[in-house]
Amino acid sequence: MIVLGIESSCDETGVGVVKLDGEGNLEILADSVASSMQEHARFGGVVPEIASRAHLESMVPVMREALRQAGVDRPDAVAATVGPGLAGALLVGASAAKAYAAAWGVPFYAVNHLGGHVAVANLEGETLPHAVALLVSGGHTQLLEVDAVGLPMKELGSTLDDAAGEAYDKVSRLLGLGYPGGPIIDKLARRGNPEAIAFPRGLMKKSDSRHDFSFSGLKTSVARYVEAAERNGEVISVEDVCASFQEAVCDVLTFKAVRACRDVGAKVLLLGGGVAANSRLRELAQERCDKADIELRVPRFNLCTDNGVMIAALAAQRIHEGAQESPISVGTDPSLSVETPQVF
């Protein structure tokens, strides 16, 4: 069975194609993505209207490229992200998916974007046991308890202010490094000293929430450090600032992720979202999981950021388990919860 997935929740227009065999195994046939990232760069973040227009312009070319890569004229099913995400962006992808499904005469499946990140993190793994997922991106920082791919997940904790990826973008802008901040800071951090500056770790006291996150204090601390240096006429090491900031973020993320695994008795940690491509996060997560006897499952780099493969993969796994197709009337939901069925 050939399943095509469309992703358009933010600034990437993604179309992925997977092949599902009778045993439930998946093979990636196509992964086509167009990003409007550079169009948002001068604004320092994603502008919803620009993102929606970019999806409209990119959808057909990206679809054609995905079908070319897959070597198929049409799939056996079409899936699309219907939430959470930017309202206009979601409408473009979901509407396109419904139109293609109707034109091809194949079933349509509505997919939860966050469930897609979990599914792709387990794409190359064995059957998923009880697990915890750490989803980290520009819009989300969440710890989720996962019993099975595609089923409702329980939120154990989330950020109380900035998402981790958002903090990267804001610190990058503060340092004059550009957008998006994640890859830039990660690259510079490799040349810096992560212990040079003692930036704070939010919500790490015993009295604090065990599974929630906070990055606004860290962001403010970086700003004050830079302002103080400029006021005193000191030359700062941008590399050291990046390394120390990144260490603080990754320290908190991995510490709380492993703690969550222990608290719920999970032996697998799934890492997903755009920030999952961060080299230090992957390294520290592996170190701490090894010490805690927890298996870490991380998607390949190109599948960390938003893509259509993860949507196709989640739909395919649920189809294999007998999921019914979605009504063509199903709407989009920018605030869709993880605690709902992931394909509906």
Swiss-Prot record:
Region feature Disordered, mapped onto this chain: 325-344
Subcellular location: Cytoplasm
Residues given in the record as Fe cation binding sites: H113, H117, D306
Signal peptide: none
Disulphide bond pairs: none
Enzyme Commission (EC) number: 2.3.1.234
Cofactor note: Binds 1 Fe(2+) ion per subunit.
UniProt binding sites for substrate: L135, V136, S137, G138, G139, D169, G182, D186, N278
UniProt KW keywords: Acyltransferase, Cytoplasm, Iron, Metal-binding, Transferase, tRNA processing
Keyword tRNA processing assigned: yes
Cofactor(s), by name: Fe(2+)
InterPro entries to which the protein is assigned, alphabetical: ATPase_NBD, Gcp-like_dom, KAE1/TsaD, Peptidase_M22_CS, TsaD
SUPFAM superfamilies according to UniProt: Actin-like ATPase domain
Any one Gene Ontology cellular component term annotated for this protein: cytoplasm
A GO molecular function held by the record: iron ion binding
Biological process (GO), any one: tRNA threonylcarbamoyladenosine modification
Compositionally biased spans, kind Polar residues: 326-344
Catalytic activity, as annotated: L-threonylcarbamoyladenylate + adenosine(37) in tRNA = N(6)-L-threonylcarbamoyladenosine(37) in tRNA + AMP + H(+)
Family per record: Belongs to the KAE1 / TsaD family.
Known function: Required for the formation of a threonylcarbamoyl group on adenosine at position 37 (t(6)A37) in tRNAs that read codons beginning with adenine. Is involved in the transfer of the threonylcarbamoyl moiety of threonylcarbamoyl-AMP (TC-AMP) to the N6 group of A37, together with TsaE and TsaB. TsaD likely plays a direct catalytic role in this reaction.
PANTHER family: TRNA N6-ADENOSINE THREONYLCARBAMOYLTRANSFERASE, TRNA N6-ADENOSINE THREONYLCARBAMOYLTRANSFERASE, MITOCHONDRIAL
Protein name: tRNA N6-adenosine threonylcarbamoyltransferase
Record organism: Corynebacterium glutamicum (strain ATCC 13032 / DSM 20300 / JCM 1318 / BCRC 11384 / CCUG 27702 / LMG 3730 / NBRC 12168 / NCIMB 10025 / NRRL B-2784 / 534)
This protein's encoding gene: tsaD
